[in-house]
Structures are given as structure tokens and as C-alpha cells.
């Protein structure tokens, strides 16, 4: 593993930054750019925690199919493991956010596969 850098300019839609077990021991991350009306799509992160950092615009977070919260930049939200969620851009401006996911670990500090 080595130090990596990602410049956040000129990203059109999606750019993976860290791939778990390749670039990092337990983290995965990237940047997402959504235009008005676009969404990531409902998904569940299973045994993974997720942090979403809103850099620009507004994100509407849906949890289990219901509107949870509208976040304006700069904002951060934590999504626990095994939660079905979606990120939607309902504003007229572009939404840019960084996501960071981390696999759960046992108390002993061993990576939970």
C-alpha cells in the first residue's frame, strides 16, 4: 500500500479513490457527482459503515425508503451497517460528495471478513 492523492476537479460522475484490501486495509472511498434529479440508487452496505461528506449542493438522504434528512454543504452523515439507503439530488445545483466506507472489526482488532 502507498500514499494516494485524488484531485477533486473535473470529476464528471463518479471516481473511486480507495479500494479496500488493495489501496487500504479496511477503507473504501470515492467521490460522487449528481446532477438535478439524479440518485445513487437504493443500496445496503451490509457489514460496512459509511460516512458521507457533502462538499457542494444539497443531498436528500433516504433510509429504508423514507426521507430521512436533507443535508446542505458542508455536512456529514453516518450510515450504520445493514441500513438500506439512497442519496438523491433534489436541488437545482450539482451535488458533490465523498463517501468513506469501513468494514467492521471484531473487538480483538482483527479484520472481519
Question: How does the language model describe each region?
Answer:
Residues 1-28, 41, 109-113:
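A short, N-terminal "cap"/entry segment at the start of jelly-roll beta-barrel domains
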Residues 81-106:
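Ligand-binding loop in jelly-roll beta-barrel domains
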Residues 47-49, 53-59:
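Glycine- and acidic-residue-biased ligand/ion/polar-headgroup-sensing regions
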